[in-house]
């Protein structure tokens, strides 16, 4: 269950975003609701997730700073770390660059959610724009990384905006691993 809202939309926006699935499930299409446009807040009410086996809990128990930026800050427990909830890709990446500058060591996890939102909205133009913003942000991040740092860029699922529906898609997703001075190799298709 996801509880979300913002002040950049109206009740009409919410009514117009209502969807009925299989004739019995009623919900709000979040991207259509305009809730993300201003003062967005979100809570993911997960069930049965043991925070003691999640990376932030394990890492902070061992003294490793943990910073979660973007949607991941809403859905992963980080009791002893720093969690910054935000949606705009440019803001998420600026916060990531800031975190890298401020911390000599640690685990920083940033979630770019706007590609997911553009996919659900079936907006390929917006999807492309978000990829370009992310590419620029990663380009600003790379010079800040040392030979001790590892950057992993990945996706948890596809969301093809041109597939003809607003659901997650199952195509292969990127897995890019970068370390300064490391020769590039093809890691092949990985199993999930």
Residue map of PLM features:
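Feature captures the catalytic ectodomains and active-site-proximal regions of enzymes
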Residues: 1-192
């Amino acid at each position: 269950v996801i509880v979300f809202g913002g002040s950049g939309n109206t009740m009409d926006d919410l009514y117009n975003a209502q969807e009925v699935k299989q004739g019995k499930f009623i919900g709000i299409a979040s991207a259509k609701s305009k809730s993300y446009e201003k003062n967005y807040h979100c809570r993911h009410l997960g069930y049965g997730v043991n925070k003691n086996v999640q990376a932030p809990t394990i890492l902070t128990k061992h003294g490793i700073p943990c910073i979660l930026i973007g949607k991941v800050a809403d859905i992963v427990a980080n009791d002893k770390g720093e969690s910054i909830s935000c949606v705009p890709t440019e803001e998420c990446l600026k916060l990531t660059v800031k975190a890298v500058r401020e911390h000599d060591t640690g685990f920083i996890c940033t979630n770019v959610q706007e590609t997911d939102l553009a996919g659900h909205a079936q907006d390929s133009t917006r999807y492309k724009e978000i990829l370009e913003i992310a590419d620029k942000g990663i380009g600003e991040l790379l010079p800040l990384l040392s030979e001790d740092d590892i950057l992993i860029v990945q996706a948890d699922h596809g969301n093809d905006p041109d597939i003809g529906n607003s659901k997650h898609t199952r195509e292969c997703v990127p897995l890019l691993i970068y370390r300064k001075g490391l020769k590039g190799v093809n890691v092949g298709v990985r199993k999930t």
